[in-house]
Amino acid sequence: MTLDPYYETMYILRPDIPEEEVESHLTKYRDMLVEAGADVLDNQMRGKRRLAYPIDKHKEGIYVQLSHNGDGQQVAVLEKAMRLSEDVIRYLTVKQEGPLPAPRVVPGSEPAAAPQEQPAANSEAAS
């Protein structure tokens, strides 16, 4: 059984950019992958953390992890945009072999639970 590979891209944003701009970067890179034909599996903001060593005179950075599948063409488009952005101070994309990560369950999300309950209600009504 061959499992399809997927990609994990971790990038670090400058710590001094405002929260609205961080959100715009999250949506910009996610939309860029979707337009290039990739499926975005997960997009997690890891928050502001201290760097192991200074990068461009920054001691902290905002970490973001993006899991997606597709071919290498989407990765090239994404990395080119990150390389040209002044707000991204580091990025790394790793090709993962193995099972896809389970989707995150966001607390308080009702739409995911609703479809599971409906078939049970329909089967009870039919009996």
Curated annotation (Swiss-Prot):
Mention any one GO cellular component term assigned to this protein in its UniProt record.
Answer: ribonucleoprotein complex
Q: What is this protein called?
A: Small ribosomal subunit protein bS6
The superkingdom listed in its UniProt entry is Bacteria
Looking up NCBIfam families in the UniProt record yields: S6 (TIGR00166)
* Matching InterPro entries: Ribosomal_bS6, Ribosomal_bS6_sf, Ribosomal_S6_plastid/chlpt, Transl_elong_EF1B/ribsomal_bS6
Residue span of region Disordered: 99-127
Question: Which Gene Ontology BP annotations are present?
Answer: translation
Its biological function? Binds together with bS18 to 16S ribosomal RNA.
CDD domains from the UniProt entry: bS6_chloro_cyano
Record's keyword terms, sorted: Ribonucleoprotein, Ribosomal protein, RNA-binding, rRNA-binding
An MF annotation (GO) of this entry: small ribosomal subunit rRNA binding
- Please give the family membership noted in the entry: Belongs to the bacterial ribosomal protein bS6 family.
Q: Where is the composition biased (Low complexity)?
A: 109-127
| Pfam families cross-referenced by the UniProt entry | Ribosomal_S6
Organism lineage reads as: Bacteria, Bacillati, Cyanobacteriota, Cyanophyceae, Synechococcales
Q: Does the keyword Transcription apply?
A: no
The SS bond pairs are: none
